[in-house]
């Protein structure tokens, strides 16, 4: 249900929300005290219910600026060809190749969600936390998102942790389900 603490849990896992007690271990590393960029460099990334994209940049630029190497002056640097090719391949994977030069702000909300997913994949995460990846999406696009998420898990070996209210999506994706309410786990299976 809404307000059960799911997004807060994700925020705590990636370091944007402090935890009150306990610890968060990822790949044998305590991450609860680490800054967000350090957690991301370990391979733990997330997407958001409300997308975090750069609306004035085109899709390829969004992909490049999201890459972990971009902190070295992306705007003024010569972009390696292989990085641009990787960005375009991922845009193709999510179905946005034809829109790669379009400003991200001109994409539909569903396309912006796909762009954000591709941006996360640019950094080859080990685990990807997805906060309601199909919320507000056209029903015909939902099946495409499900198919891509299954492929990300099976073909790329990326573990997915998904917050989702759509039971069709949950049943299509989940190998294990946890149900939270008011910050407590009610059930798992």
Cite the ranges covered by each PLM segment:
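Conserved catalytic motifs of ABC-family nucleotide-binding domains
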Residues: 124
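Conserved ABC transporter NBD signature motif
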Residues: 22-29, 42
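H-loop/switch region of ABC-family ATPase nucleotide-binding domains
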Residues: 164-165
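Catalytic Walker B motif of ABC-type/P-loop ATPase nucleotide-binding domains
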Residues: 128-132
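Conserved ABC ATPase "signature" region
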Residues: 64, 78-99, 140, 147-150
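Helix-to-loop junction immediately C-terminal to a conserved catalytic motif
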Residues: 14
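Conserved ABC nucleotide-binding domain
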Residues: 32-33, 90-108
């Amino acid at each position: 249900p809404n307000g059960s603490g799911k997004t807060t849990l994700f925020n705590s896992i990636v370091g944007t929300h402090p935890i009150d007690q306990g610890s968060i271990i990822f790949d044998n590393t305590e991450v609860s005290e680490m800054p967000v960029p350090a957690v991301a460099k370990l391979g733990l990334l997330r997407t958001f219910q409300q997308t975090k994209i750069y609306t004035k940049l085109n899709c390829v630029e969004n992909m490049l600026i999201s890459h972990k190497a971009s902190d070295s002056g992306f705007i003024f640097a010569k972009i390696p060809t292989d990085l641009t090719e990787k960005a375009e391949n991922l845009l193709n994977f999510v179905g946005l190749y034809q829109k790669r030069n379009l400003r991200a702000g001109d994409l539909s909300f569903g396309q912006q969600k796909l762009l954000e997913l591709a941006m996360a994949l640019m950094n080859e995460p080990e685990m990807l936390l997805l906060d309601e990846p199909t919320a507000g999406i056209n029903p015909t696009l939902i099946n495409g998102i499900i198919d891509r998420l299954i492929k990300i898990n099976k073909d790329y070996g990326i573990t997915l942790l998904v917050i989702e209210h759509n039971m069709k999506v949950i049943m299509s994706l989940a190998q294990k389900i946890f149900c939270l309410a008011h910050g407590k786990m009610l059930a798992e299976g």
